[in-house]
Regions:
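Metal-ion/cofactor- or nucleotide/acyl-coenzyme-handling active-site neighborhoods
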Residues: 2-358
Length: 358
């Protein structure tokens, strides 16, 4: 027993010394970045993998577009009529795209399409500013140009061709000044304005309002389509836009409100066809509207990728800036894939690259 006790007294200091040296050694390695940290590498690897997958899918879609463009486009009348009939039977744009006194009576409730909240009751004051009837009527325009804001329009020389359309739809108050007119034209029949733009550019119309009115001059007396009833916060600023034009806007665009019921129907229509985005983009909404009210639908500026299809040169997100869109809300490449399918079927025509002089 005495021998064992003596042995333990000798071993204990040695064990403690070895442990101390081991800890000190590992601390030294860590501080000098000799030991890699697995946790710091995992996200990077995941991010690279995700980015690689995204690029791969984009390349597939670009290849599809180029394949379709290798053949001369021709309208397929039977396909067009079939798709238009199906779209009209589900969404009813002619009677429901815009909130009117006919489809939204006094005392009825407006249900927001973008959020679950208490319905908005149509008061006398709100009813009075609603359009008395649908602005599209029962007429069908022979040709419509839906102009997206994609960077592919830069240096396209498509302005003259766009202006030749009978009805021209533009998205989110894009600039039409002399810098861009050659590429995007200046004719406008309908232009949309998201509430976010009214907040960002015009302080939500809580301060000076005349700059907003002046900025609308390039659109002439086009329809100004406001999504006033998508979200609760969209309503006040959209109503301020309406009253601003009523107070200051002689010879300015005519403000009307996008119908949330139409948007719900349209979202369901596209989801049934495999589009699972949170909500459709303005471009897809306007392309869908055009398919119901026009005999021939042409899309310009619809290209959701950062390289040109012809020569892979880098292009900006918009023809006027390189600001990122809300990709978490919209699924632009997937939407484009659906539109590309309609192009291939001869239902709509997507224009990529430069336009030929007329």
């Amino acid at each position: 027993m005495r021998v064992m006790r003596t042995l333990m007294l000798w071993l204990l200091p040695i064990i403690l010394l070895c442990s101390f040296c081991s800890v000190a050694f590992w601390i030294f390695l860590s501080n000098n970045n000799v030991i890699p940290h697995p946790s710091s590498r995992i996200p990077q690897k995941s991010s690279e993998t995700k980015s690689s997958k995204g690029c791969s899918k984009d390349n597939v879609l670009i290849a599809k577009a180029l394949e379709n463009y290798s053949h001369k486009w021709k309208k397929h009348e039977a396909n067009f009529k079939r798709f238009r009939s199906l779209l009209s039977s589900k969404c009813h744009a002619v009677s429901k795209a815009v909130v009117t006194q006919n489809n939204t009576p006094l005392g009825s409730n407006v249900i927001y399409d973008g959020e679950r909240r208490k319905p908005l009751q149509v008061t006398q004051a709100l009813f009075n500013i609603l359009a008395k009837e649908q602005p599209f009527g029962n007429a069908t325009w022979e040709s419509c140009a839906v102009v997206g804001n994609g960077g592919i329009l830069a240096n396209s020389s498509c302005g003259e061709e766009i202006n030749s359309a009978q009805f021209v739809i533009r998205c989110n108050l894009p600039p039409l000044d002399n810098r861009y007119e050659k590429d995007v034209g200046n004719k406008t029949s309908l232009v949309t304005a998201n509430p976010s733009i009214l907040h960002e550019k015009y302080s939500g119309l809580m301060e000076r309002r005349r700059p907003f009115v002046e900025s609308l001059r390039p659109y002439g007396q086009a329809l100004l389509l406001l999504p006033a009833f998508s979200y609760g916060h969209s309503t006040p600023v959209s109503l301020r836009a309406f009253y601003t034009l009523e107070d200051f806007g002689s010879d300015s665009p005519l403000p009307v409100f996008l119908n949330p019921e139409y948007l719900r129907r349209l979202l369901k229509f596209w989801r049934e066809r495999g589009l699972n985005s949170v909500r459709p983009s303005t471009g897809l909404i306007m392309a869908s509207l055009a398919l119901e009210i026009c005999s021939n639908v042409h899309l310009y500026g619809f290209w959701p990728f950062n390289k040109h299809p012809n020569d892979s040169r880098p292009i900006t997100n918009h023809y006027y800036d390189d600001r990122e869109s809300k990709k978490n809300v919209h699924s632009m490449p997937t939407e484009f894939e659906h539109l590309l399918k309609l192009h291939k079927q001869g239902v709509i025509r997507i224009h990529l690259g430069e336009c030929q002089p007329t």
